[in-house]
Every structure is written in C-alpha cells, then in structure tokens.
C-alpha cells in the first residue's frame, strides 16, 4: 500500500512540472483522391502533423507555395507527414497537377 501511495505522489509531482496550458500535438490526415486534396482546407495548431495519403493511381505531391513543406513524389499507397510550426495560412498544390490545390491554416 505504501508503494502505491508513493507511486501516486510521484506521478502527481511529474504532472505538476508540466507547463500550464501545454497541449499535445495532434495528427491530421489529408487524403489525395480523385485528383483532389480531401479536405482541401484544414485548420491545425502550430506543431501539429499532417499526413498526406495518396489513394489515386497517379503520382502527386503536396508542396507549399511558401516552401515550408514538400512531400516529394507520392505514388499510389504512399504517404508523407509534415509538421508546420508557424501560424498563418499556407497554400499548397500538387506539382504534377496544377488544378490540385489546398490550404492549411495554422493557429
């Protein structure tokens, strides 16, 4: 019983050391299908990760207009993850198909 109380007290002490308001980064998925990003617009928090998954038969990229991320070539079944740290709106596109566009809004 004493070990349980000591373990509980140690766990509480560790929790107390965490910064107030600290949040865990979230993971988001954008699917590439039908020559479109789905969803085409996504809102995330700074530090979150976006995984782009290509479900099309054609190769695609997800390339930020401002150069902040680029998945490189994704063939069918491939995926790539990017983490965005700075707040703001980031437009991105597929380098192979100019009509494929999306926006990431980072808060």
Residue ranges and their predicted role:
Residues 2-8, 12-107:
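Extracytoplasmic copper-binding redox domains, predominantly the cupredoxin/blue-copper superfamily
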